[in-house]
C-alpha cells in the first residue's frame, strides 16, 4: 500500500491510497468512507451495487468471519475477496472491539483474551498472533493490530494499564505480521481513553514500532462529542504526516466532517446501512424518517440532489409503502441511497479540500442541516 498526501485545506487532507492486487492496482481517494461488511457482505447488497455507490474499499470483521465460516472455508476460496467476490481493497479489524463488546463473557490477560463463543458457547482464545494469522488468511489489504478498546468511562490507571498492554500487543502483532511475510499494510491503533498524556505515549510507542498507517481507537464508545473532538484534535497532529489516519467506527455525517476538520483520512461505520434498514435516511438537508405517515402520499424523490438508483427511480410514497409492508426491496433501496449519500459527501469533501475551500464547505454543510458549526478546540482556547 502506498499513501500520497496531495493537498491540504486547513487541517483537512486530500490524499490517495494505492493497492496492488492480483487483478491490478486499486486506488482509494481520501478522505474515504468504508462501508461495513461484517459477515463478508454489506447487508442486502451485491458487491457491484456497493461499488456503484462509489465505495472503493470495504471493512470486514475478523472476529465474526473467524467464528463463521472459519479460516479453512476462507482459504478454500483463496481469501475473503474470492469468498465474497469483492476485488477491491478490504480493511479488516482485529477482533479487539468485538471482544471488548462481549463484556462479562471475556477475560483479558497478557497472553490474549479468553471468551465464550457467542455462537456455540465454547471457550476460545484470541491473541495478537492469532489475529494476525486470521487476517493473513482473509487476505486483508489493511490489517489492524490486536488491541484492547479502552471503555468509557475509565479511570486514569485503568486507561494507562490498558494502553500499555495494547502497546505490547502492537509489538507482538507487528512481529507476527512480519514472520508471516505478509506483503499487505499493517495499521497501529492509538489508545489512552480521554487522557491526552496517555494518547501521546501511545502515539510515540506505535511510531517507534513503525506502521503503515495509524488509527485513533477507543472513541465513539459512549463519551460526549466534545470529548471525542478534544482527543481527536490533540492526537492527530502527533501522527506522521506521510501516513494515513483512520478514525474507527465513526459515524454520523457530521462526525465525518468533524473528523476531516481534524486531519482524519479514513472512516467506517454501520450507521448508513443499519439506519437504512430502520427507515432512517440521510438527505442533503438532514434526515427523512420514511416511516412517518406524511410520506404515504409524497410523490417526490427522497433527495432531489442525489443521483442514486433509488432517488432517480422511486418516490417517498413507494419507499414508505415498501417499509410498511416489510418488503426486502425497501431495505435494499434505502441502503443504496444511504451509502450513496455517504460517498457523495466524501466526494464533496475531497473537492472542497482540492479547491482549498473546506472551511466554506463546513459552513454550507451545517447551514443545510440547520445546525451550528461546532468550534474547534483551538478556537475555544483563543
UniProtKB/Swiss-Prot annotation:
Which pathway or pathways does this protein act in?
tRNA modification; tRNA-queuosine biosynthesis
Key words, A-Z: Glycosyltransferase, Metal-binding, Queuosine biosynthesis, Transferase, tRNA processing, Zinc
The record, for Gene3D superfamilies, names: Queuine tRNA-ribosyltransferase-like
**Required cofactor(s):** Zn(2+)
Q: Which GO terms describe its biological process?
A: queuosine biosynthetic process; tRNA wobble guanine modification; tRNA-guanine transglycosylation
Q: Its Gene Ontology molecular function terms?
A: metal ion binding; tRNA-guanosine(34) queuine transglycosylase activity
Question: Gene Ontology cellular component?
Answer: cytosol
Annotated binding of Zn(2+), by residue: 306, 308, 311, 337
Which residue positions are annotated as catalytic?
93 (proton acceptor), 268 (nucleophile)
EC identifiers of the protein: 2.4.2.29
Stretches the record annotates as RNA binding: 249-255, 273-277
Q: Which family does it belong to?
A: Belongs to the queuine tRNA-ribosyltransferase family.
Q: What does this protein do?
A: Catalyzes the base-exchange of a guanine (G) residue with the queuine precursor 7-aminomethyl-7-deazaguanine (PreQ1) at position 34 (anticodon wobble position) in tRNAs with GU(N) anticodons (tRNA-Asp, -Asn, -His and -Tyr). Catalysis occurs through a double-displacement mechanism. The nucleophile active site attacks the C1' of nucleotide 34 to detach the guanine base from the RNA, forming a covalent enzyme-RNA intermediate. The proton acceptor active site deprotonates the incoming PreQ1, allowing a nucleophilic attack on the C1' of the ribose to form the product.
- PANTHER family, A to Z: QUEUINE TRNA-RIBOSYLTRANSFERASE (PTHR46499:SF1)
Q: Mind telling me what this protein is named? A: Queuine tRNA-ribosyltransferase
What's the source species for this entry? Answer: Actinobacillus pleuropneumoniae serotype 5b (strain L20)
Give the organism's phylogenetic lineage.
Bacteria, Pseudomonadati, Pseudomonadota, Gammaproteobacteria, Pasteurellales
Amino acid at each position: 500500500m502506498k499513501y500520497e498526501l496531495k493537498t491540504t485545506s486547513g487541517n483537512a487532507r486530500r490524499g490517495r491510497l494505492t493497492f496492488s492486487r492480483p487483478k491490478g492496482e486499486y486506488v482509494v481517494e481520501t478522505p474515504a468512507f468504508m462501508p461495513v461488511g461484517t459477515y463478508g457482505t454489506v447487508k442486502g447488497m451485491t458487491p457491484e451495487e456497493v461499488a456503484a455507490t462509489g465505495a472503493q474499499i470495504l471493512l470486514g470483521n475478523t472476529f465474526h468471519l473467524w467464528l463463521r465460516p472459519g479460516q479453512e472455508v476462507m482459504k478454500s476460496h483463496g481469501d475473503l475477496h474470492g469468498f465474497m467476490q469483492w476485488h477491491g481493497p478490504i480493511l479488516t479489524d482485529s477482533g479487539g472491539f468485538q471482544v471488548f463488546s462481549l463484556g462479562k463473557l471475556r477475560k483479558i490477560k497478557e497472553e490474549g483474551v479468553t471468551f465464550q463463543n457467542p455462537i456455540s458457547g465454547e471457550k476460545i482464545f484470541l491473541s495478537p498472533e492469532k489475529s494476525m494469522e486470521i487476517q493473513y488468511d482473509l487476505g486483508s489489504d489493511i490489517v489492524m493490530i490486536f488491541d484492547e478498546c479502552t471503555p468509557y468511562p475509565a479511570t486514569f490507571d485503568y486507561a494507562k494499564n490498558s494502553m500499555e498492554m495494547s502497546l505490547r500487543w502492537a509489538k507482538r502483532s507487528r512481529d507476527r505480521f512480519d514472520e508471516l511475510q505478509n506483503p499487505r499494510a499493517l495499521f497501529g491503533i492509538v489508545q489512552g481513553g480521554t487522557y491526552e498524556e496517555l494518547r501521546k505515549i501511545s502515539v510515540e510507542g506505535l511510531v517507534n514500532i513503525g506502521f503503515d498507517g495509524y488509527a485513533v481507537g477507543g472513541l465513539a464508545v459512549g463519551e460526549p462529542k466534545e470529548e471525542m473532538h478534544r482527543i481527536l484534535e490533540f492526537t492527530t497532529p502527533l501522527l506522521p504526516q506521510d501516513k494515513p489516519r483512520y478514525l474507527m467506527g465513526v459515524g454520523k455525517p457530521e462526525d465525518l466532517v468533524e473528523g476531516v476538520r481534524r486531519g482524519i483520512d479514513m472512516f467506517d461505520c454501520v450507521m448508513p446501512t443499519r439506519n437504512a434498514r430502520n427507515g432512517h435516511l440521510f438527505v442533503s438537508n438532514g434526515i427523512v424518517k420514511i416511516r412517518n405517515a406524511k410520506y404515504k402520499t409524497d410523490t417526490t424523490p427522497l433527495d432531489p440532489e442525489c443521483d442514486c438508483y433509488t432517488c432517480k427511480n422511486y418516490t417517498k410514497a413507494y419507499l414508505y409503502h415498501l417499509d410498511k409492508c416489510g418488503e426486502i426491496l425497501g431495505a435494499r433501496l434505502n441502503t443504496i441511497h444511504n451509502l450513496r449519500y455517504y460517498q457523495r459527501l466524501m466526494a464533496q469533501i475531497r473537492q472542497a479540500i482540492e479547491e482549498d475551500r473546506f472551511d466554506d464547505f463546513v459552513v454550507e454543510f451545517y447551514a443545510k442541516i440547520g445546525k451550528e458549526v461546532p468550534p474547534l478546540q483551538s478556537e475555544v482556547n483563543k
